[in-house]
Amino acid sequence: MTALGLVLLSMMGYSQHMQQANLGDGVATARLLSRSDWGARLPKSVEHFQGPAPYVIIHHSYMPAVCYSTPDCMKSMRDMQDFHQLERGWNDIGYSFGIGGDGMIYTGRGFNVIGAHAPKYNDKSVGIVLIGDWRTELPPKQMLDAAKNLIAFGVFKGYIDPAYKLLGHRQVRDTECPGGRLFAEISSWPHFTHINDTEGVSSTTAPVVPHVHPQAAAPQKPHQSPPAAPKV
């Protein structure tokens, strides 16, 4: 990844230890917060897939809105987990990682854990949600940098395939996610890929619905969810 350089992801109690990765010239930093740091509830169950992941899928949360302080971003992660576990009946928060407006990386399900964020891709991808509504506004630079650094680190540690394909959520289901402005941004990133309808089909995954608060006043293009929410 160009211009990232030395990526230093400070590990705070995370079992998948993040270390220094020599990726070129220049220095970028990001901090990873563990599940215990943001007060995550225990998952109902954890299912792993064999890495490295061939896909990275970018999301926006839409709701909750962008957070700029770490306490607010921690609450946003808890709110998303509550919605996914308690309302949808899923095993855990749907995403692999969250990115806050504070520039922090928040551990969701983590690497090599089957997610609940993208149909057909849950068992072969890293799902990264940038907290906020990015339909018309671009996320702050620190959020974009954190996402890039996380991807670069995942490649360096072998969690993400070096030839990974970068996708926006809208490419794998009928949704505005990750928002038009953010989608335009990631379209310029290395590894962004245009896909066809037959890629990534898996019989082990099921359609999922992104985190949208039930009282959101300006809904995204709606998803057609199954009668019973999948527990993934």
UniProtKB/Swiss-Prot annotation:
Catalysis: reaction(s): Hydrolyzes the link between N-acetylmuramoyl residues and L-amino acid residues in certain cell-wall glycopeptides
The N-acetylmuramoyl-L-alanine amidase domain, residue ranges: 53-179
Domain of life: Eukaryota
Single GO molecular function: peptidoglycan binding
N-terminal signal peptide: 1-15
Segments for region (Disordered): 213-232
Consequence recorded when altering T175K: Loss of function
Pfam families, per database record: Amidase_2
GO cellular component: extracellular region
Disulfide topology: C67-C73
Binding site for Zn(2+): H59, H169, C177
Cofactor: Zn(2+)
GO terms of biological process kind: defense response to Gram-positive bacterium; innate immune response; negative regulation of biosynthetic process of antibacterial peptides active against Gram-negative bacteria; negative regulation of peptidoglycan recognition protein signaling pathway; peptidoglycan catabolic process
InterPro entries, alphabetized: Amidase/PGRP_sf, Amidase_domain, Peptidoglycan_recognition, PGRP, PGRP_domain_met/bac
First-level EC class: hydrolase
Annotated site (Essential for zinc hydrate coordination): Y95
Glycosylation sites: N196
Keywords tagged on the record: Disulfide bond, Glycoprotein, Hydrolase, Immunity, Innate immunity, Metal-binding, Secreted, Signal, Zinc
Induction comment from the UniProt entry of this chain: Strongly up-regulated by PGN from B.subtilis. Regulated by the imd/Relish pathway.
Family indicated by similarity: Belongs to the N-acetylmuramoyl-L-alanine amidase 2 family.
Role summary: N-acetylmuramyl-L-alanine amidase involved in innate immunity by degrading bacterial peptidoglycans (PGN). Probably plays a scavenger role by digesting biologically active PGN into biologically inactive fragments. Has no direct bacteriolytic activity.
Protein name as it appears in the record: Peptidoglycan-recognition protein LB
UniProt lineage: Eukaryota, Metazoa, Ecdysozoa, Arthropoda, Hexapoda
